[in-house]
């Protein structure tokens, strides 16, 4: 029996393909009802043969689907809700309703309230009512959500809590295409609205592929009701799709476990005629894009040429300036700003000031002092040291002298007396001794000086930074008079 049923299904599919594809590529904008009738009849006979073979194991409410293949994959996901003249759900299907929590009431009271509301409008298809509070508490775990998903065939929800459901029910409802359909429970004609939601269908067009399926009925329905539902779906597609009916490529009818039988096919010529304007617009856009790219490349080449010309001009100007100037210094090429009269004046004034500063710094070259000689400034400092017995404050180094170099220190063995005993001919810059005596007479504190105090050695001056402290010179050890040696008597 099963072999004969499969043979009949294949023969029906062959007849369907032969009738659906005409010899000439004529535009078929309307659906052929005879072809739809043949395909549906073949599917029903196949399902009856399977029922006789497997007996009670067969599901009597096996669903029928209409497969839609589009010419182009859409850029965005599309969810189209369509109304059908005949209900596609049987009486044995379980339907669940999610409701809002009523104020100042428990979950049991809210369920009773909405059950009375449905009975008042004569609605008996809803099998269970679940409030939002019970959904949060009892169906929080992963296993509970899967159990809820498998226990019901269709889900309805109150329009007031529709935005709260995605975080509560999870992603599995959306993956298995069991998204709850929103209903306005406050409407006056509630029975009609709920029946339209239950009896209608939804087309989910994904952006991952060009093929999608729509539920159009079940095996227990009459053939005429199924055909009317298919015609209603095709009308809805021609209105809701982005490019209307021209975007439909193929239509098939199938069950969950059977082969797909074709009922409509379009041709490439029809698609080209329908999308002639769109193709022209695309060509124009591509031509504009290519023009922009060419212009951009031309601008890049012009910029490169300008930069190369500037570099060559600067090199040539350097080569011209070098032989003209007899000095070793090489003049730098003037920039564009220096070529203007205003900028040139400013640059000349600054250049003069810089030249003067460099000349002054060059004139102030520090003079080197020999080791054995002394300057008059050093003599004055030594005289004050002998008079007061205190060190003179350390002078900061001259800013004109370089800080990196150190001045040589005086020898440690040299005492002030030895320095004074030098001949005046060797040191022409020395002052006469008369001035030294006059300075001694003016300072009254010279007589109060302690005779036991030895004169301090002259400090070695280092050109260091002013922040560093100068080291103190070590005092010379006291010299005790030696006892004269008495010759031994023989």
From Swiss-Prot:
It is found in: Nucleus, Nucleolus. GO terms for cellular component: chromosome; cilium; cytosol; intracellular membrane-bounded organelle; membrane; nucleolus. Keywords: Acetylation, Coiled coil, Isopeptide bond, Nucleus, Phosphoprotein, Ubl conjugation. One of its GO terms (biological process) is regulation of apoptotic process. The modification Phosphoserine is found at residues 361, 392, 396, 427, 443, 469. The modification N-acetylmethionine is found at residue 1. Its main location: nucleus. Residues 280-313 form a coiled coil. Induction: Down-regulated during cellular senescence. Residues 329-343, 376-385, 427-460 have a biased composition (Basic and acidic residues). There is a cross-link at residues 120, 254, 380, 435, 461 (Glycyl lysine isopeptide (Lys-Gly) (interchain with G-Cter in SUMO2)). CDD domains: Ribosomal_L1. Belongs to the universal ribosomal protein uL1 family. Highly divergent. Regulates cellular senescence through inhibition of PTEN translation. Acts as a pro-apoptotic regulator in response to DNA damage. Interacts with ING1 (isoform 2). Interacts with KPNA7 and KPNA2. This is Ribosomal L1 domain-containing protein 1.
